[in-house]
From Swiss-Prot:
Pathway: Cofactor metabolism; pyridoxal 5'-phosphate salvage; pyridoxal 5'-phosphate from pyridoxamine 5'-phosphate: step 1/1; Cofactor metabolism; pyridoxal 5'-phosphate salvage; pyridoxal 5'-phosphate from pyridoxine 5'-phosphate: step 1/1. Signal peptide: none annotated. This is Pyridoxine/pyridoxamine 5'-phosphate oxidase. FMN binds at R53, T54, V55, L56, L57, K58, Y68, S69, K75, Q100, Q135, S136, W180, R190. PROSITE patterns: PYRIDOX_OXIDASE (PS01064). Homodimer. The keyword Membrane does not apply.
Length: 208
């Protein structure tokens, strides 16, 4: 039996984890970190072949952590076949010896309206680039890409650039958040938040 006060405490653990991330993220943005919103994104194909790359965090809230990409890119194909992912933030300049945040969870596409709104906020040249790029496909030469950019620019001259149909947002809904605080002599501090099969959040202090 889960008592109401304990259940509320478990719910509050997720809010606590998000608040901790938010505070660290703001600290990173105020630090010497060049791209504090950069995060490693690990995915795996349906066959279990892993891959990892750097993407940028565009939004986070209680629903999860959002990034954008082409749905036909390798990461997009992985996530359509196997909608699970892991994220990693590493802020080396924070605290005594850096801070690392790991996040694991299930992935869903954001609503089209949300993707439209974010795409509309991007610089025009970035919007044009999203149309011109066939992400991760072989490219004959840099000049070929420049020609595609010029073609897209001419196509949308004098009007708004709409979001390409295949340019979508992905949201990672956390089931695990782990905070690693680096210290000298490898005497690190690790806190792990995870949700169990019944949907209750737990918090653990881990050996470094």
């Amino acid at each position: 039996m889960i008592f109401p006060c304990l259940f509320q405490s478990m719910l509050n653990l997720y809010a606590e984890a998000l608040s901790t991330f938010s505070l660290l993220f703001e600290e990173a943005k105020s630090s010497s970190e060049i791209e504090p919103d950069a995060m490693m994104l690990a995915t795996a194909s349906l066959e279990g072949h892993p891959s990892v790359r750097t993407v940028l965090l565009k939004k986070f809230d209680a629903r999860g952590f959002v990034f954008y990409s082409h749905i036909d890119s390798p990461k997009g194909r992985d996530l359509q076949a196997n909608p699970q992912a892991a994220l990693l933030f590493l802020w080396r300049s924070l605290r005594e010896a850096g801070v690392q945040v790991r996040i694991e969870g299930r992935v869903q596409q954001v609503l089209a309206e949300e993707a439209d709104a974010y795409f509309a906020s991007r610089p025009r040249q970035s919007q044009i680039g999203a149309w011109a790029s066939m992400q991760s496909c072989p490219l004959g030469s840099p000049e070929e890409f420049q020609a595609r950019l010029a073609e897209v620019k001419a196509t949308f001259e004098g009007r708004d650039v709409p979001r390409p149909e295949g340019w979508v947002g992905f949201r990672v809904a956390p089931r695990v958040l782990e905070f690693w605080y680096g210290a000298r002599f490898r005497l690190h501090e690790r806190w792990r938040y995870e949700v169990d099969a019944a949907g209750y959040w737990r918090k653990f202090l881990l050996y470094p």
